[in-house]
Amino acid sequence: MCGILAVLGCSDDSQAKRVRVLELSRRLRHRGPDWSGIYQNGFNYLAHQRLAIIDPDSGDQPLFNEDKSIVVTVNGEIYNHEELRKGLKNHKFHTGSDCDVIAHLYEEHGENFVDMLDGIFSFVLLDTRDNSFMVARDAVGVTSLYIGWGLDGSLWVSSEMKGLHEDCEHFEAFPPGHLYSSKSGGGFKQWYNPPWFNESVPSTPYEPLAIRSAFEDAVIKRLMTDVPFGVLLSGGLDSSLVASITARHLAGTKAAKRWGPQLHSFCVGLEGSPDLKAGKEVAEYLGTVHHEFHFTVQDGIDAIEDVIYHVETYDVTTIRASTPMFLMSRKIKSLGVKMVLSGEGSDEIFGGYLYFHKAPNKQEFHQETCRKIKALHKYDCLRANKATSAFGLEARVPFLDKEFINTAMSLDPESKMIKPEEGRIEKWVLRRAFDDEERPYLPKHILYRQKEQFSDGVGYSWIDGLKAHAAENVNDKMMSKAAFIFPHNTPLTKEAYYYRMIFERFFPQNSARLTVPGGATVACSTAKAVEWDASWSNNMDPSGRAAIGVHLSAYDGSKVALPLPAPHKAIDDIPMMMGQEVVIQT
């Protein structure tokens, strides 16, 4: 992932302003350590921090059309760029970058070209011929993007909050699937509006081979790279399928010819964690070069402040899962790898979270999947993008391919419903699609392994250790004042309070706290789905183990009232609050 920053229509074209833009752009350099670029045209500035994945030799940004009247700074990957180039025969391209097509598409089609892009992207385009501009973000928000407004009437755009939060009167997350155009009076326009967006119940019959074909296509197109890459492999269904398909199709690709035909896979976890065991087994089955990274609870706790600074959230489940991903990304980048494929998005599309066992009917099931996909940019996309980008590593997510989402979301949700009495566990339609007896994609027990959320799979003591640490830093008196100190999204647990304190230190603006979602949740549900089971109101925790009666290692946080237990041995040196009685909601 690259880092982009744009300041448009400001009242200052001085050298001091240019220096300030460069200073702010450097805050995004972790996203793109390979090269920096800046373009200034009067009161407009476009800056870029590049992570070179395609055409590393000549693809530096900003990018231009032939006469340099149209300028683009972009963070993204356009998978169909070669096909798009064929339709632009009268245009001359300056680079081999996949993003070079954007300026030329605009020149040919105006602002109506965005839906032609198959990929992930955030970009700012400046048309110097009339001093107009447009900003756009990909369909579901795989790339991160923020928009803000300065006191002088300027418009700011940045890949991360840290690039604009000090200089804007107000800022917010740029909505996925939208564009913002100065030509339309400075308003947002939704360019991505698929049939499933209205949440009406679809009726397409389930065809396993259609799902298989659509997902294989989504993975294959993401093998486009000019740099070393690998796959994140936790041993769960989603990452294992991504790894299996990649291993099958890697031979013969340009990447294989340049870097070798053997796939590299990566896994992280506490010693003895479920993911480490399963990931190793899948790697051996697929024949990948497997890299296992171990961390301790203390390692994770030590990284929390860095994680919150980079991921820019105080959401509990996002921080829990981002921390091991953050640690793993640093290790991966140290090996010279610049891109990884990852399995985010499947649980939202297929209802894979364990709370979906309680969906009362297919309409509720489908509407919850729609809500989850629409909110992905606030949670898993945010994590996958920023936890990896902290070290100049790009994460690609084939489950969030536009065509695959449309195929999967057109299914009659009755086929996705979880029915244990019929042998249908969560994500049954996906598992069945890849259950091939003649040429197996995965071992059966991996193909039908129960869902583990990433923050659980890396080791159950990870979350338990976080809670114990938070309890050492947040006392009951602080919690009693939580609603006064934090009236918006008031933290309900000591762990949430602890993360909020750190977040507010980095991002104290009201606009910043409003970018983070809130509301009731159990096992990563939306607030609406909490209504499915009355008992959940007493056990509000985003961990999958909160799904009592569903998860094999479920716990009931509402029924445990004990002295605070000793934390994991990795944090034994932290003083304990002796004798305090608390309700443990693990």
From Swiss-Prot:
Assigned GO CC terms: cytosol
Binding positions (ATP): 232, 268, 342-343
Asparagine synthetase domain span: 194-517
Record carries keyword Amino-acid biosynthesis: yes
Entry EC no(s): 6.3.5.4
Keywords: Amino-acid biosynthesis, Asparagine biosynthesis, ATP-binding, Glutamine amidotransferase, Ligase, Nucleotide-binding
Catalytic-site annotation from UniProt: 2 (for gatase activity)
Enzyme class: ligase
Reaction(s) catalysed (UniProt annotation): L-aspartate + L-glutamine + ATP + H2O = L-asparagine + L-glutamate + AMP + diphosphate + H(+)
Record PROSITE patterns: GATASE_TYPE_2
Gene3D superfamilies: Glutamine Phosphoribosylpyrophosphate, subunit 1, domain 1 (3.60.20.10), HUPs (3.40.50.620)
One annotated GO molecular function: ATP binding
Residues engaged in binding L-glutamine: 50-54, 75-77, 98
Annotated site (Important for beta-aspartyl-AMP intermediate formation): 344
Pfam families xrefs: Asn_synthase, GATase_7
BP terms from Gene Ontology: L-asparagine biosynthetic process
Domain called Glutamine amidotransferase type-2: residue spans: 2-185
Family per record: Belongs to the asparagine synthetase family.
PANTHER family listed in its UniProt record: ASPARAGINE SYNTHETASE, ASPARAGINE SYNTHETASE [GLUTAMINE-HYDROLYZING] 1
Record-given protein name: Asparagine synthetase [glutamine-hydrolyzing]
